[in-house]
Amino acid sequence: MPEIKVTPLGAGQDVGRSCILVSIAGKNVMLDCGMHMGYNDDRRFPDFSYITQNGRLTDFLDCVIISHFHLDHCGALPYFSEMVGYDGPIYMTHPTKAICPILLEDYRKITVDKKGETNFFTSQMIKDCMKKVVAVHLHQTVQVDEELEIKAYYAGHVLGAAMFQIKVGCESVVYTGDYNMTPDRHLGAAWIDKCRPDLLITESTYATTIRDSKRCRERDFLKKVHETVERGGKVLIPVFALGRAQELCILLETFWERMNLKAPIYFSTGLTEKANHYYKLFITWTNQKIRKTFVQRNMFEFKHIKAFDRAFADNPGPMVVFATPGMLHAGQSLQIFRKWAGNEKNMVIMPGYCVQGTVGHKILSGQRKLEMEGRQILEVKMQVEYMSFSAHADAKGIMQLIRQAEPRNVLLVHGEAKKMEFLKQKIEQEFHVNCYMPANGETTTIFTNPSIPVDISLGLLKRETAIGLLPDAKKPKLMHGTLIMKDNSFRLVSPEQALKELGLAEHQLRFTCRVHIQDPRKEHETVLRVYNHLKGVLKDYSVQHLPDGSITVESILIQATAHSEDQGTKVLLVSWTYQDEELGSYLTSLLKKGLPQSTS
């Protein structure tokens, strides 16, 4: 029986370091190749030795697919391709291909140049890795090889994020990456057609959360920022360079404009310009409103938001700063946090998910004394707020996607075990499909029962509907025809068309049944009696007595011969074609009942 095997090397009952191996119909595909933000040693990368202990990985993988540019989905890519060794194709969308190297280089600078870490990829490795990337368009079917094909669907979440369908023959898997089922201020909602994959691999970051209305959250966010600024405090909003950052910038920009506020808003240097550039370049990936108004006004050119200089952090008075990265695990956001943490007037607003091990996760868990580098203790007096502006699907969104795609099986990744368990039960109850949640390194085997698509010729369809009643949508309809297999595809055509295409002559298959009749008369007299009997009974049929002494009823032939041993018995040979099976059987049973007694 065909099977699909799935092994998470990262994001199995965990968030961070997304990397999932899928084996489908003899093809091996790696989905994402991320880095874990909670570790500073080798554990930050997935364990690629699972694929092979020695030798390059190219021999074991048919392709790699990257869903979007966040580092927990693409951060290990240069390490994987250049240090471990992979030369095969890497697929991602055009915006992901453009933005991915910028974020990788940013992170490399923080890790290597500032922290001095070794066993990390170089700038050249990032460039060499990106040369192996093949960029894909949405809804474009890409043929990886003769049998393996992939297709990208819009995922919302961040600019360029995509869900991917992987198909080999009749078997298919859909991998969601990270997605958002509700549109926001700059991106549309994720969408997929009713593709009915054998397996849907979905993220489950917010497996147990159903978010309140977006408007309430936005109002709450603006109120907290406004109150802090009014009392002279500073607000730090840790974000990743692209995505949620633009969402919140648009929100604050319009609020500052409306309220005529004067407190400065800053954004990490350099990244705003880059973000603007890419949002202009890939405007088709944003939502309808931004696309419509883009010619008159670029939503991403902010009047109130200025580039940040690190010296500004020490300026007196209120300010709002968007700084990267979003989990307070390194970089500018962490530096500013250390400076402002000791003042209760200040506030840090965490707008998204933080993985375990990061400073963001620690303060959200209520820790107020943090051990920083060099065993230095940092006391957190500033207010800590968590406001979910996450671009991930919540429980309702995940259920909605399952309803849209109609998969035969579901597998959960990118979430916490307890929350996954709850969602798993909910999915199984509501959709009556198997749901799996493997841990890292654990292989799940899913047996598939692939359906084989068959094209039906128009002529055959017309003929079937002409002779039958209107089809009932709820009941399967039987189709009679000839199945032709050619170039790995199946077609159902009429027998006449099949004969014509294949250059064959039709052979008639006839069935013959012997019926014994007690009649001492001569054979030609018996035939005449049979003819008169059938003529009287079968008034709606053409019954003929032929010169050679045989009888026809439509295409059915009846002949009479004497019994070899009993002169008083005649043998009737009733012969019919397969098409006249019903009439042939009826005639046979009629004759077996015998002939009516003659009056002569």
Curated annotation (Swiss-Prot):
The main enzyme category here is hydrolase
- Stated name of the protein: Integrator complex subunit 11
Binding-site residues for Zn(2+) 1, renumbered to this chain: 68, 70, 157, 178
Q: What does the record give as the organism's lineage?
A: Eukaryota, Metazoa, Chordata, Craniata, Vertebrata
One GO cellular component this record assigns the protein to is:
integrator complex
Residues holding Zn(2+) 2: 72-73, 178, 414
Q: Where in the cell is it found?
A: Nucleus; Cytoplasm
The cofactor named in the record is: Zn(2+)
Keywords attached to this entry? Cytoplasm, Hydrolase, Metal-binding, Nucleus, Zinc
Q: Which family does it belong to?
A: Belongs to the metallo-beta-lactamase superfamily. RNA-metabolizing metallo-beta-lactamase-like family. INTS11 subfamily.
